[in-house]
Amino acid sequence: TRTDSSAASDVYKRQQLPYPLMNIINGGAHANNGLRIQEFMIRPDRAKSFSEAMRICFVVIKNLSKLIKDKGLSTSVGDEGGFAPMISSNNQALDLIVSAIKKSGFVNGKDVSICLDVAANELYKKNKYSIHSKSYISVDKSIKEYQKIIKKYKIKSIEDPFAENDWLAWNKLMKSIKKVQIVGDDLYVTNLERLKKGFLNISSNSILIKLNQIGTVSETLDVIKFAQTIGYKTIISHRSGDSEDTFIADLAVGTNSNQIKTGSLARSERVAKYNQLIRIEEELGKKARMNKIN
């Protein structure tokens, strides 16, 4: 879809495929288990093609399913297609994912990276957070807990680590950790003015793009263009309640966005986007390239 927006001036010239941020374990508001973090995802960082990225994710998911079953837990899925086992510890979920990556023959943090969507709005009360357990702790203590899991599990991306209006907490986190993708979703809601404020505040280094948050394609393109101009990574995203429409797959390629977040390899409304990206890659043929992560 082309538009006359100034933001669209050259974004269509590139032909690069986004890396998938694939949901593999659901928690928070997307599942009925006790996990505090809403989404546990993987990103196949060394995939040379989108088709290979899908194969890598499939193998990890298959082995994760076996590991969950071996523990006597259910492999039923949550809203976004990831498994929703009845476990209550973030570390338990992360341990399972690390084991699945290793069992698949990949190296965690190199071949495949773990990424999180904390959705901290749901875990915020009176300037404190219950991200890592049911107990509410201060921002500074929460940052220390983030530092621990980043080091232990080689986490490469964290979305919405703090509440949407806790600007100081976001800035503190950005100053405290390096080489981690800090993604604003609720922080920005695909709104150009909030993105400009976040940039001045040094709140994040990446933005999640949801087309229907801002309402029009033109406004969405303006946000993407500005984000890319200031050096932010752009991640095109589905919604937790979605349809089989595949437009965001085309949007991700057309705007040269680094990554796409569209659920797991389950549920037709999620898989449809991945299938469209495979079709795009096939159509591009030898011109097809994967985007850059770093």
Per-segment meaning from a language model:
Residues 19-35, 79-83, 118, 244-247, ...:
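Conserved phosphate/anionic-ligand binding catalytic regions in large, soluble enzymes, centered on
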Residues 15-78:
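Mobile "lid/hinge" segments at catalytic clefts and subdomain interfaces of large enzymes
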Residues 91-294:
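Catalytic core of soluble alpha/beta enzymes
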Residues 39-50, 74-90, 119-133:
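Active-site-proximal beta-alpha loop/turn segments in soluble metabolic enzymes
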Residues 1-8, 12:
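Single conserved hydrophobic/aromatic residue that forms the stacking wall/gate
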Residues 64-68, 72, 82-84, 93, ...:
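Gly/Ser/Thr-enriched, mixed-charge loops and adjacent short helices
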Residues 10-13, 25, 46, 188, ...:
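Acidic, glycine-rich active-site loops and adjacent beta-strand->loop/helix elements
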Residues 9-10, 54, 82:
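Metal- or metallocofactor-binding catalytic centers and their adjacent structured scaffolds
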